[in-house]
Structures are given as C-alpha cells and as structure tokens.
Amino acid sequence: MPTETQLFDTAELFKVLGDSTRIRIINLLSEDEFCVADIAARLNMTQSAISHQLRLLKAARLVKSRRVGQQIFYSFYDTHISDIIRTAIIHIAED
C-alpha cells in the first residue's frame, strides 16, 4: 500500500501533467531528444514559453537535459512517463 507521501507525490506529478503544452512537449520528446528551438518550432510556440515548461518538467524529473556546445537537448528522464502518457491516450481513445 502506498504511503501518504507517495500519494501526495503522485498527485503532484499529475498536476505537472495537467497542462496541454507540457503534454505536447512530452509527446514530442517520445520521438527523440530536441533542443528548445526545435521544440518551439515544432509546437509553434516561443522559445521562452517552451523553456518555462521545460523547467517545470525538469524539476518534476520528467525530462533531463544535456549540453552540446551552446545548445541544451531535452529527453525523457526515463521511460515511465512515456508509458503513462501512452496509456492515458489509449484510455481517451476508447469508445
């Protein structure tokens, strides 16, 4: 049985996932790793808006980053999050 702390942390995770922009970013990162400029271009958003959302996702340990020269590339922290999103999309798509 989960502890109170685990239940609280799970609720916090779902709060972070409760934003359509962050879900769109996560969905994109399920394909590959991307830098902020590429994410912004693909989602038709500003780089500052994407950076803000990525900070929240990184703080929640949903994405990680790596620096290559002056660019920072973002990817999934681990595969658990893509499994959660995939399961949610399947659930929504059910008749």
Feature annotation, model-predicted:
Residues 1-9, 78-95:
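Amphipathic alpha-helical dimerization/coiled-coil segments
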